[in-house]
Design a protein with these regions (language model features):
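Secondary-structure transition/turn motif
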Residues: 60-62, 90-94, 114-119, 144-148
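Short hydrophobic/aromatic-rich beta-strand segments that constitute the beta-sheet cores
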Residues: 27, 55-59, 84-90, 109-113, ...
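Helix-adjacent hinge/juxtasegments
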Residues: 64-103
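Hydrophobic/aromatic beta-strand elements that line small-molecule binding cavities or substrate pockets
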Residues: 42-48, 73-78, 99-103, 127-133, ...
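Amphipathic/hydrophobic helical signal segments and adjacent flexible N-terminal regions
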Residues: 1-54, 62-69, 136-137, 146-165
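Short solvent-exposed loop/turn micro-motifs enriched in small/polar/acidic residues
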Residues: 38-40, 68-70, 94-95, 123-125
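Short, solvent-exposed coil/turn segments at beta-strand boundaries
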Residues: 48-53, 82-83, 104-107, 134-138
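Acidic, glycine-rich flexible loop segments
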Residues: 93-96, 104-106, 110-129
Length: 165
């Protein structure tokens, strides 16, 4: 059977509560950190159902000023064991892996990293917290970050709009 013959079908019941996230979202945000100058960025975020009990997550961002690539993330959003619970597993090209746990309830998805992995040359991130507010075809979000030398502080804020389902 070829890839073209595979039918994704309907979302399984276990992930139906994640349906409001499905699609490709594009927007802009503002970033900063004590160790860097503030910056404005564009972003493309995709939550895609690939036929199983999870969603695939893909993110890429770029500087609005000149289009320079900034960041990429790839991973999976899965249901947890309790109603509304979610688990996010991500790989970052900065030499990091992230496992976050949280909830998606009434359009609010809040996640806290419970495990961070790092390569020998990976960025010294020790904590991440993500907050998403889903309102129809718009998502507003915030990301807080802690490193070995900086406590948890706001790093990114942005807003994306669904451009395809």
């Amino acid at each position: 059977m070829s890839v073209e013959d595979v039918v994704i079908g309907v979302l399984p019941d276990e992930v139906a509560f994640l349906a409001p996230l499905l699609g490709t979202w594009v927007g802009e945000g503002r970033g900063g950190y004590p160790t860097m100058e503030p910056f404005d960025y564009g972003e493309r975020l995709t939550f895609d159902h690939v036929g199983d009990t999870f969603l695939q997550y893909m993110l890429r961002s770029w500087l609005l000023e000149d289009g320079t690539p900034l960041h990429f993330e790839r991973g999976f959003l899965r249901p947890g064991t309790e109603a509304g619970a979610v688990e996010l597993t991500l790989a970052h090209p900065l030499g990091l892996t992230e496992v976050s746990h949280g909830t998606l309830i009434d359009g609010h998805m809040d996640l806290v990293a419970t495990s961070m992995g790092r390569t020998a040359t990976g960025m010294a991130v020790v904590g991440l917290e993500r907050r998403y507010r889903i309102d129809g075809d718009e998502i507003a979000y915030e990301l807080d970050m802690a490193t070995e030398t900086t406590p948890m502080i706001r790093h990114l804020t942005g807003r994306v709009r669904r451009v395809s389902a």
